[in-house]
Amino acid sequence: MEKDMKLLGMGLFWNDLAVGDRFGTVGRTLTETDLVNFVNLAWLTEELFTNTEERENMAIAGRVVPAALVYACAEGLLLPMMQGTGLAFLNATLDVKGPTFVGDTIHVECSVSEVRATSKGNRGLVRTENEVVNQRGETVLAYNPLRMMKGRDS
């Protein structure tokens, strides 16, 4: 690619972000295929996710999906924010607020809560408060990752 050509799809640099900045992602519908593939990949053989007959006797109606799948999809939805600029995922707390089901469409609402330089000036730490919201406007998952991100060259 030519040096003077602008690259589409690159993430944000830590020094372009400020506390209070807010972002939203596009939506993604979770499908039966997503559930089956994730459960098989992670070997989450809990009958809650694998046995539709047993589901009839449980308190939650519908095909519930693991919160780990919801989290993984949320991170994928946020990827454009960090594409090529994210360096490390350092930590997070995670709180499951409610069930997510096959057929639900989720998006992520993200608010920057912390931005600071590291001792190496070309890197920074960014913490966001992320809420995963379904099509009914219900927050189903909340987490606050701290990430190391590249800085914009001066």
Residue ranges, per PLM feature:
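HotDog/MaoC-like acyl-thioester-processing domains
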Residues: 1-18, 100-154
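Hot-dog-fold acyl-thioester-processing enzymes
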Residues: 1-91, 152-154
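Short helix-to-loop capping/linker segments positioned immediately adjacent to catalytic or ligand/cofactor-binding
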Residues: 25, 96-97, 117-118
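Conserved hydrophobic positions within beta-strands
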Residues: 27, 74, 96, 110-112
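Short, conserved aromatic-histidine micro-motifs
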Residues: 89-100
